[in-house]
């Protein structure tokens, strides 16, 4: 998905006003890991996902998660913020219903919304709540990051909004995983075209 218009969706972080904001202190890390964080922050900053923030009320630490290929994924520990945020009750589909709906189709195309979360902008009034600390400063995401309590519900909401008339007919959506299904070969390419034009 290209950047999604904020008139369609933006991610909000409502917080319980009785819960006090938490500022996590910078955690110690191996020097080689801090360099990986610096590299990832620079990359995300340069593509416009991040901005520098001063005096944030909420502040979380970065956590590096090793990947199978030897690289690491930079995540943010939003546990404190997530505790203060009420659950978004937008429904996620039942997996068994999705499986039943694709049964019997001749062709299935599986798609993953690559960097899909990052196509959804943060609501301006909530942007600084997702602030995080590094050895080089504090930043916040201008786009919806992984790790926020209701990010999956927000993504499901936008996918349902964009594809509502195709779901359970030609397509199935579970958060950022999408399946285009067709009963015959001739219908599959036009169905895929319709999907990609919409997304």
Predicted regions and their residues:
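Retroelement reverse transcriptase polymerase core
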Residues: 1-199
